[in-house]
């Protein structure tokens, strides 16, 4: 707050805002704003001064009837109208009516060490106050019209062909092939631009300046976006730079070391290998981010240079700015067209994803290979499920013929690369199943939910597979493939009872190969089981 504000709320007084109007407490003479008077008085018929507690009666019970501090209001209006500043010199208050002109910092034409604040319209000269008085002290010169420098009219541009005429128009004729679009009245009525469409030079200049302002606004936003991106990149680089105690890299290194300290002494070598893996990953990330940073810095520098050029263009004379119209607009448009895509939040994450498997090796950012065998009777929908996972079109999801032999499809899910082995389910092929599930990490067994009469056969084959010692601790997911909303009446309960009676653990799901419903949940269950089996550390 300056010295012209309310000492209660520290807000400046205003002649335009009713709530900031200065009100005089007649009981003591102090002044507060109208808004503070409302807060202090409440519904009372009197108001107590917040400075000396003197009571002032509110005329008619309405705070609007409290006297305004007109002296202060008049002073505020003078400051607003004149654009000047009030300065205290000892006990004397001095009003500077040329404060705006001083900000221009133009040299006085009489004395270059002085700052010009006045313009003489007759002499066409910029003068300081002292030189203005000294040079116009005679009776004749004192009649010259002198105005504040901020009110100086723009310089007139004279026609190149008719030097005694002032340029007043700009040619807008598309077929005009003259050197300059600027025209005076002679050019318009009798010269090269006769009959051409045209506009006033003031309008053309203002339109051009408006376009420049729009480009400046857009470029400022782009510059701000790039600035934020650079700040984020610097933050991530700081987090991933070795030696930064508060960085994510150091936190990850410490977690890795803590893990290996809990292991036997023989794991020391593996610990150092793991730390090197983290460092190498961080170096690669930093190199990639440095490349992105350099690209954005180059664009930011170009935008800054363009903005500087456009800012200078705004204060050019009319003729000069119009002469450079095409160059200015081309520069602004080419700079605005620069790609300013920034990294998304996932690319700026400082977390380092890692996991430990049974081989005691640290894995970062690589997919874990896993073999999943799909088993089931012929026609159960195994191939349709795999094709649905591969995003095959709807009309080709359902396989018209049973699988002869096997198909292999690879699905990427989370940090796993799941190799699905779709094995044929014809009776003559079932004795070959053991050659596929013997090396499997998971078994996905599919039952046709429409073939109720084959439920017992499907359960029998599943029990035969799980009784094989080759299966071992391999997780089993059992899925009933049926259409959503398809009623099995009491057959589903019977199927669940048979599954619960099996002497091994399994995970039960329902899915629809035609629509893909429920398949994502099954794949998620498979990866959860694989993570438990592998002893993967949570990321």
Curated annotation (Swiss-Prot):
Zinc finger (RING-type): 6-53
Gene Ontology biological process: intracellular protein transport; protein ubiquitination; vesicle-mediated transport
Origin superkingdom: Eukaryota
Pathway linked to the protein: Protein modification; protein ubiquitination
Keywords: GTP-binding, Metal-binding, Nucleotide-binding, Transferase, Ubl conjugation pathway, Zinc, Zinc-finger
One GO cellular component, as annotated: cytoplasm
Segments traversing the membrane: none
UniProt-annotated stretches for the region ARF-like: 369-539
Residues the entry annotates as binding GTP: 376-383, 422-426, 481-484
Record bears the keyword Ribonucleoprotein: no
GO molecular function: GTP binding; GTPase activity; transferase activity; zinc ion binding
SMART domains for this protein: ARF, BBC, BBOX, RAB, RING, SAR
Annotated Pfam families: Arf, zf-B_box, zf-RING_UBOX
UniProt keyword Ribosomal protein, yes or no: no
EC nos: 2.3.2.27
B box-type Zn finger ranges: 103-149
Family annotation (Gene3D superfamilies): 4.10.830.40, Classic Zinc Finger, P-loop containing nucleotide triphosphate hydrolases, Zinc/RING finger domain, C3HC4 (zinc finger)
Catalytically driven reaction(s): S-ubiquitinyl-[E2 ubiquitin-conjugating enzyme]-L-cysteine + [acceptor protein]-L-lysine = [E2 ubiquitin-conjugating enzyme]-L-cysteine + N(6)-ubiquitinyl-[acceptor protein]-L-lysine
Top EC class of this enzyme: transferase
PANTHER family, sorted: E3 UBIQUITIN-PROTEIN LIGASE TRIM-21-RELATED, PROTEIN CBG20824
NCBIfam families assigned: small_GTP
Function description: Acts as an E3 ubiquitin-protein ligase.
Sequence similarity: In the C-terminal section; belongs to the small GTPase superfamily. Arf family.
Protein name: E3 ubiquitin-protein ligase arc-1
């Amino acid at each position: 707050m300056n010295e012209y504000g309310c000492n209660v709320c520290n807000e400046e007084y205003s002649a335009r805002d009713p709530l900031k109007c200065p009100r005089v407490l007649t009981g003591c003479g102090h002044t507060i704003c109208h808004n503070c008077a409302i807060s202090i008085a409440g519904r009372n018929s009197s108001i107590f001064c917040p400075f000396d507690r003197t009571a002032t009666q509110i005329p008619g019970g309405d705070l609007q009837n409290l006297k305004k501090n007109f002296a202060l209001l008049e002073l505020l209006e003078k400051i607003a109208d004149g654009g000047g500043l009030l300065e205290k010199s000892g006990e004397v208050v001095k009003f500077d009516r040329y404060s705006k002109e001083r900000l221009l910092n133009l040299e006085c034409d009489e004395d270059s060490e002085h700052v010009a604040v006045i313009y003489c319209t007759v002499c066409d000269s910029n003068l300081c106050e002292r030189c203005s008085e000294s040079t116009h002290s005679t009776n004749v010169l004192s009649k010259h019209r002198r105005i504040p420098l901020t009110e100086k009219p723009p310089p007139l541009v004279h026609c190149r062909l008719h030097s005694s005429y002032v340029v007043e128009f700009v040619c807008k004729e598309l077929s005009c092939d003259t050197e300059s679009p600027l025209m005076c009245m002679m050019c318009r009525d009798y010269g090269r631009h006769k009959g051409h469409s045209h506009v006033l030079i003031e309008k053309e200049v203002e339109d051009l300046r408006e376009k420049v302002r729009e480009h400046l606004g857009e470029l400022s936003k782009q510059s701000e976006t790039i600035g934020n991106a650079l700040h984020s990149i610097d933050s991530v680089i700081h987090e991933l730079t070795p030696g930064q105690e508060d960085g994510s890299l150091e936190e990850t290194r410490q977690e890795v070391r803590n893990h290996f300290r809990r292991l036997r002494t023989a794991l020391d070598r593996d610990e150092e290998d793991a730390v090197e893996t983290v460092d190498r990953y961080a170096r690669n990330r930093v190199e990639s981010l440095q490349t992105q940073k350099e690209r954005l810095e180059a664009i930011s520098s170009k935008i800054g240079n363009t903005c500087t050029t456009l800012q200078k263009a705004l204060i050019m004379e009319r003729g000069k700015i119009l002469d450079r119209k095409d160059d200015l607009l081309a520069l602004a448009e080419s700079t605005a067209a620069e790609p300013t895509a920034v990294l998304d939040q996932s690319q700026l994450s400082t977390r380092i994803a890692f996991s430990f498997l049974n081989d005691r090796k640290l894995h970062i950012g690589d997919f874990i290979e896993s073999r999943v065998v799909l088993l089931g009777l012929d026609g159960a929908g195994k191939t349709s499920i795999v094709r649905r996972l591969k995003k095959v079109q709807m009309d080709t999801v359902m396989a018209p013929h049973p699988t002869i032999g096997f198909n292999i499809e690879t699905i990427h899910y989370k940090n796993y690369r799941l190799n699905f082995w779709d094995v044929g389910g014809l009776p003559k092929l079932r004795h070959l199943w053991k050659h596929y599930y013997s090396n499997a990490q998971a078994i996905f067994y599919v039952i046709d939910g429409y073939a109720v009469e084959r439920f017992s056969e499907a359960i029998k084959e599943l029990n035969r597979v799980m009784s094989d010692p080759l299966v071992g601790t391999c997780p089993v997911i059992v899925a009933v493939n049926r259409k959503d909303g398809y009623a099995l009446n009491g057959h589903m309960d019977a199927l669940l009872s048979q599954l619960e009676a099996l002497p091994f653990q399994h995970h039960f799901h329902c899915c629809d190969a035609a629509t893909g419903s429920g398949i994502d949940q099954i794949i998620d269950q498979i990866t959860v089981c694989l993570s438990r089996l592998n002893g993967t550390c949570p990321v």
